[in-house]
């Protein structure tokens, strides 16, 4: 069994890998010509950065000794400042990753610490499924509604702006609640299932079985994704494969993360 300190080091390694993938994916939007296709392997690798961050966020919430949901407000505020200062756009509208992480901390802080792994996992998968059902229902809009902070031109009416917020928050913003909140709940479920919370789940045999389960899950989910795969277009120059985040992609991303965790803790 690994100590808590070792697990944190391993999470730091996963975070470092995710940061590298994120930098690669985000820089591609400015390095490559906007209307030219990006290399597929780069698109594939960059697509695993965001789910890794979300899953790790859930694991950190499950590891926290005292839930602090209000920290999510500060992260959302930073997201708003980034929108205004960097992108010069109206905040709390397109819902980039910082908004989603902040909101999930608020929603998940207490459940991640006190719910069982089973309850967290079932809720997480339900959130993933809701995202897919909304996409199947034709509610996902590929084009984002954004408002530039250009004071030379009048802003759209408040009614028009407010009408787009719920849809982009829950369905088709950069990182909508459905399905991305599900990743955080599943990350918390993974953490709740570790030996720190489940002393009976220890030993080399358990680690070996978890490794095989992770491999089988990866094969099944990636096979399903391959059978249902349609290469998505780039979205405003960003080339990750989760626009929209279909169920096959979500399950594959979780499987890759689970396999990495199993390898680290094996």
Regions found by a protein language model. Name each.
Residues 1-266:
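Alpha-helical transmembrane segments and their immediate juxtamembrane cytosolic regions
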């Amino acid at each position: 069994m690994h100590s808590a300190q070792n697990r944190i080091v391993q999470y730091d390694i996963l975070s470092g890998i995710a940061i590298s993938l994120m930098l690669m994916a985000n820089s591609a939007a400015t390095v490559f010509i906007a209307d030219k296709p990006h290399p597929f392997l780069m698109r594939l690798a960059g697509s695993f950065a965001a789910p890794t961050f979300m899953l790790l966020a859930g694991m950190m919430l499950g590891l926290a000794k005292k839930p602090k949901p209000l920290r999510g407000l500060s992260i959302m505020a930073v997201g708003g400042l980034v929108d205004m200062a960097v992108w010069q756009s109206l905040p709390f509208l397109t819902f980039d990753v910082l908004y989603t992480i902040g909101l999930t901390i608020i929603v998940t802080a207490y459940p991640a610490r006190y719910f069982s792994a089973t309850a967290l996992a079932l809720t997480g998968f339900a959130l993933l499924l809701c995202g897919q059902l909304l996409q199947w229902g034709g509610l996902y809009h590929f084009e984002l509604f954004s408002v530039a902070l250009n004071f030379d031109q009048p802003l759209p009416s408040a009614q028009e702006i407010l009408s787009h917020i719920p849809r982009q928050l829950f369905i088709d913003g950069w990182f909508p609640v459905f399905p991305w909140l599900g990743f955080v709940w599943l990350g918390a479920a993974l953490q709740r299932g570790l030996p720190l919370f489940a002393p009976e789940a220890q030993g080399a045999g358990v680690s070996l079985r978890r490794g095989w389960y992770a491999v089988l899950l990866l094969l099944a989910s990636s096979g399903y994704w391959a059978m249902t795969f349609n290469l998505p277009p780039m979205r405003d120059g960003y080339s990750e494969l989760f626009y929209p985040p279909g169920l096959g992609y979500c399950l594959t991303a979780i499987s890759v993360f689970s396999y990495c965790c199993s390898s680290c803790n094996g």
